[in-house]
Amino acid sequence: MVVKALRQISVGQNGVGAFIFPCKKITLQYCNWGGSSQGLRDFLTSKRLAKWAEKYPQIQFEVVAKAGHPVLKAEYINGLNKAICVRNLNVDHVELKLKLLRESSGAQLRHYPKNANVLSLNQSVRGVWSPLHVDPALRHRV
């Protein structure tokens, strides 16, 4: 009997085996002509990007010259993307936004209700409690 192997690509998950950096690619998009891109152009010419690339080899950096306002775009291992407009920001603020994208997990921001302690995809085993489902003889009388 011949055994056939399954052809699947393993999906990287943090906490299973090793730590995987959530951010996999950062694209720096700027305009050569526009004044709003001056901070990002200064960031690129000051060799700070080269230091970032040496410090974080697991992140792929891509520089794109395109008309319009400057944008930093990040791609994450969970398939989501984030984009931050850095128009009219100086070099230090551009680096802060780059750091924000690097440290982010890529997950969408959510509002959690005050008493939602457990998030689950499954229903409760006991069901939802309601005083109307109790036998009327056992209900508390005021």
From Swiss-Prot:
<dbReference type="InterPro" id="IPR039927">
    <property type="entry name" value="Ribosomal_mL43"/>
</dbReference>
<dbReference type="InterPro" id="IPR036249">
    <property type="entry name" value="Thioredoxin-like_sf"/>
</dbReference>
<dbReference type="GO" id="GO:0045454">
    <property type="term" value="P:cell redox homeostasis"/>
</dbReference>
<keyword id="KW-0689">Ribosomal protein</keyword>
<dbReference type="Pfam" id="PF05047">
    <property type="entry name" value="L51_S25_CI-B8"/>
</dbReference>
<dbReference type="InterPro" id="IPR007741">
    <property type="entry name" value="Ribosomal_mL43/mS25/NADH_DH"/>
</dbReference>
<comment type="subunit">
    <text>Component of the mitochondrial large ribosomal subunit. Mature mitochondrial ribosomes consist of a small (37S) and a large (54S) subunit. The 37S subunit contains at least 33 different proteins and 1 molecule of RNA (15S). The 54S subunit contains at least 45 different proteins and 1 molecule of RNA (21S).</text>
</comment>
<keyword id="KW-0687">Ribonucleoprotein</keyword>
<keyword id="KW-0496">Mitochondrion</keyword>
<dbReference type="GO" id="GO:0003735">
    <property type="term" value="F:structural constituent of ribosome"/>
</dbReference>
<dbReference type="GO" id="GO:0032543">
    <property type="term" value="P:mitochondrial translation"/>
</dbReference>
<dbReference type="GO" id="GO:0000002">
    <property type="term" value="P:mitochondrial genome maintenance"/>
</dbReference>
<dbReference type="GO" id="GO:0005762">
    <property type="term" value="C:mitochondrial large ribosomal subunit"/>
</dbReference>
<comment type="similarity">
    <text>Belongs to the mitochondrion-specific ribosomal protein mL43 family.</text>
</comment>
<protein>
    <recommendedName>
        <fullName>Large ribosomal subunit protein mL43</fullName>
    </recommendedName>
</protein>
